[in-house]
Amino acid sequence: MRGAFDLANKKILQDKNSYGKPRPWRQKKLENLRYAEYLSILLYKKAHKVQGCADVLRFRKLPDGSTKLYQTWFCKSRLCPLCNWRRSLKNSSQLTEILAEAHRRHSTARFIFLTLTEENSVDGVDLKRRLKALTHAFFKLVHYKKVSKNLLGFVRSTEITTNANGSYHQHLHVLLFVKSAYFKGTGNYLSQVDWTNLWQKALKSSYKPIVNVEAVRTNKSKGKSSLLASAQETAKYQVKSADY
């Protein structure tokens, strides 16, 4: 009875973000356990270590009476959903600071969100080669004079999706930071057609690749009243961890 009484009076602790919303530890832990199960089936030795990832969360009581997560242990496996989620939070925080500093130095500059794709779908054996070619094409693109003359910096991430037939499709998501002059005059502004032609040239492809480009604007629906806040929201997508 004492055990039942103690359990009934236990306080459930929650780790919340700065907006007061609970962080999805349970969801990520379930994904982690599923990943550990796959490793176990394949007889990987690290399955046990992955299974124990973030099993214990230690909270610290703050002076105001609230509690805050201050310690846990991660398996640090590259494909662990829990570790990737925490890594994405860290990367997002660091990226937000970088964007804020960039905006402070160039207050009139603008952010552009660019998606670059290619038609080819590849198997696992050829994926590494195609990713290398895609990266090479991207650096050719940003060094073209039409792009580089107004480009102040960029953040790039690679997304790989799986097709129904088991092949892979790779594409790039890029957050560009450009001078305000980019939006002034035909000699500076690049339309979607311009970006498509430049990307086709960089890829050395015989087909027109799919390219999407849009200026980052104020997101009033989410209460983002400044251009920088909207860019920060976009940047979070840049470092979003994959689903497993």
Can you describe what each PLM-predicted range is?
Residues 119-140, 145-244:
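Conserved His + Asp/Glu catalytic blocks
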Residues 81-85:
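Short, cysteine/histidine-rich loop/knuckle motifs that typically chelate Zn2+
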Residues 88-124:
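Short microdomains enriched in Cys/His and/or Lys/Arg
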Residues 77:
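Residues immediately within or flanking Cys/His clusters that coordinate Zn2+
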Residues 62-63, 106, 163-165:
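Short, ordered beta-strand-loop transition motifs
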Residues 28, 32, 43-46, 88, ...:
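Intrinsic-disorder-associated interaction segments
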Residues 1-70:
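N-terminal alpha-helical interaction blocks
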